[in-house]
A protein has these predicted regions:
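Rossmann-like NAD(P)(H) cofactor-binding subdomain of soluble oxidoreductases
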Residues: 2-61
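A non-catalytic, amphipathic alpha-helix used as a structural packing/dimerization or gating element
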Residues: 7, 89, 150-161, 165, ...
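A structural signal for well-ordered alpha-helical segments within the folded catalytic domains
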Residues: 29, 33, 84, 153, ...
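Substrate/ligand-engaging "lid" and interaction regions
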Residues: 52, 58-155
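Short, flexible active-site loops
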Residues: 135-146, 173-176, 211-217
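Small-residue-rich helix-loop
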Residues: 148, 156-210
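C-terminal helical cap and adjacent loop that interface with cofactors, partners, or active-site loops
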Residues: 185-264
């Protein structure tokens, strides 16, 4: 998870040898940026663009459910001279084809979880007020609605403008409509609702005496806001690109989390 990357890099740093390869299954939570800052720009790094599968713990330390396997994976490398050997090793380990990206930003920037989760959370809970409880836990994906799709598409349009201003190829990071074989909010809603691997994933909520409340300790909040959407927003600011929909979600998120990410 994004919040643990810095701590783990600092922990292993004294034991690293020259040209030791350090990698992350999840790159979109700031792995490359954090590794550069801590290990220096000569560090040998690799990172996946998307996780190989969805994992859910069933029995802690013993059993997990692995769902939604990808047909193909993509990684970016930095300062790794024999990247072909790394590629073959990862393919053998995961039994999945792995392709090489051209730039580490192509792995660092994704319109997957950093956009998908916050947009859905906003649609689910933006009318929530402190003290309000819900009678049931909605499905995060199987009750996905057009409001969520419309906001997600709007955020992705802003994200695509950022990509166009960076030295990356557009092809490895398709629009969400392209990725989900959809053409508008309605078809995207149908598609997301139909994904079998997503079927039984609940919205992040916790049970209380009054009912169910949003679980602000969930990684959907603790990771995808500060280590996902905020990274995208920070790059947009450097490029002077306006992101009104991303801003709206971040402002709401920082309010319910009692944080300060951006200014109005």
């Amino acid at each position: 998870p994004g919040f643990a990357i810095e701590e783990e890099l600092l922990h292993i740093q004294p034991f690293l040898q020259e040209k030791t390869c350090i990698g992350s299954v999840v790159s979109c939570t700031g792995f490359f940026f954090t590794a550069y800052r801590i290990l220096g720009k000569t560090a040998s790094l690799f990172g996946f663009q998307r996780a190989p599968f969805i994992a859910r713990v069933q029995t802690y330390g013993q059993k997990a459910l692995l769902l939604g396997y990808k047909k193909e994976l993509q990684i970016a490398t930095v300062n790794i001279s024999k990247s072909d050997i790394l590629l073959r090793t990862l393919q053998e380990m995961l039994d999945t084809p792995v392709r090489m990206l051209h730039h580490f930003l192509e792995a660092s920037l994704t319109n997957s979880n950093p956009l998908l989760h916050p947009a859905r959370l906003y649609s689910l809970f933006h009318t929530w007020s402190r003290g309000k409880a819900y009678h049931e836990i909605p499905g995060f994906y199987n009750s996905w609605d057009e409001e969520s799709s419309e906001l997600l598409i709007a955020c992705d349009n802003e994200f695509q403008q950022i990509l166009k201003a960076l030295p990356v190829r557009i092809e490895p990071i398709p629009t969400l409509l392209e990725y989900y074989d959809s053409y508008d909010a309605r078809s995207l809603t149908r598609k997301i609702r139909s994904i079998i691997a997503f079927k039984h994933i609940p919205a992040p909520m916790e049970k209380t005496e009054k009912g169910f409340l949003p679980d602000f300790k969930s990684r959907y909040f603790t990771e995808d806001f500060p280590f996902g959407l905020l990274i995208i927003k920070s790059i947009a600011d450097v490029l002077n690109i306006c992101t009104p929909n991303i801003d709206k979600i971040l402002l709401w998120g920082q309010d319910v989390l009692n944080k300060e990410y951006i200014h109005e």
